[in-house]
């Protein structure tokens, strides 16, 4: 019971009113059942993403499903995804990149063994460097013939820019050493390996595929819980009913 109460305190501390608590509690419960982390940990991640991407209460269930599917479809685990998104989300929001696209980037990096805060800082560097390239980075992109903003000065879609960079490398027949130089100049030494992974994932269509799967993820957390119920049987049902009893108690107290 402490866990669910703690989760609701976290939701409230994150600026959640009664509506937010009612929207987020069942989502947090299902996430905890699906990923076996505490409701408090799940509430903190859920509300962190809600606020970073400035999403409304009616999007809370969708955020939960996007997070569940990121762990389901990529090598990202709870801690890795949580750390990575904490770093990347605020910059992504500023760059006009959606939660689904950000989760796709973080997931693709985990698949390539770039995990946790490294995936977060890598994604963040790629987004911020492409949003407002300066100095040598700007010159390097110009040499490659890649534009980062449209005629109105808005940042072009990040996946498109990454695809065009890859295409330019191929068209200009740049060797691996030359490519590495460009990547370092544009993205910085630290983030260049993450940028290379994301560029490849953009070019193969992996980022688009993951983004599409995450956009269509509504109801997937509940599905995962149902599958676990079928596979784990009695033990899981006891665990679940204990959790759900707590959820209903808390709602009754509020009303």
Predicted regions and their residues:
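Alpha-helical architecture feature
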Residues: 3-11, 19-71, 80-87, 98-255
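Charged, solvent-exposed structural "stalk/scaffold" segments
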Residues: 92-98
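Membrane-interfacial loop-to-helix junctions in multi-pass transporters
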Residues: 76-77
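Catalytic phosphate-handling regions of large nucleic-acid enzymes and associated NTPases
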Residues: 16
């Amino acid at each position: 019971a402490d866990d669910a109460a703690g989760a609701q305190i976290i939701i409230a501390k994150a600026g959640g009113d009664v509506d937010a608590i009612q929207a987020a509690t069942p989502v947090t419960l299902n996430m905890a059942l699906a990923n076996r982390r505490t409701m408090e940990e799940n509430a903190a991640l859920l509300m962190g993403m809600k606020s970073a991407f400035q999403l409304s209460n009616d999007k809370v269930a969708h955020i939960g499903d996007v997070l569940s599917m990121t762990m389901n479809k990529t090598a990202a685990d709870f801690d890795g995804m949580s750390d990575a998104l904490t770093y990347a989300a605020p910059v992504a929001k500023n760059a006009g990149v959606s939660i689904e696209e950000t989760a796709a980037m973080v997931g693709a990096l985990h698949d390539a063994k770039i995990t946790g805060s490294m995936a977060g800082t890598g994604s963040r560097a790629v987004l911020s460097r492409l949003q407002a390239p300066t100095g040598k980075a700007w010159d390097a992109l110009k040499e490659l013939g890649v534009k980062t903003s449209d005629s109105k000065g808005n940042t072009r879609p990040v996946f498109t820019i990454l695809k065009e960079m890859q295409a330019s490398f191929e068209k200009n027949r740049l060797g691996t050493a030359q490519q590495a130089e460009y990547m370092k100049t544009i993205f910085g030494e630290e983030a260049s390996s993450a940028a290379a992974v994301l560029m490849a994932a953009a070019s193969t269509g992996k980022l688009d595929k993951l983004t599409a799967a995450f956009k269509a993820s509504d109801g997937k957390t509940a599905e995962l819980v149902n599958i676990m119920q079928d596979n784990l049987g009695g033990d899981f049902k006891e665990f679940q009913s204990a959790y759900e009893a707590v959820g209903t108690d808390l709602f009754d107290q509020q009303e």
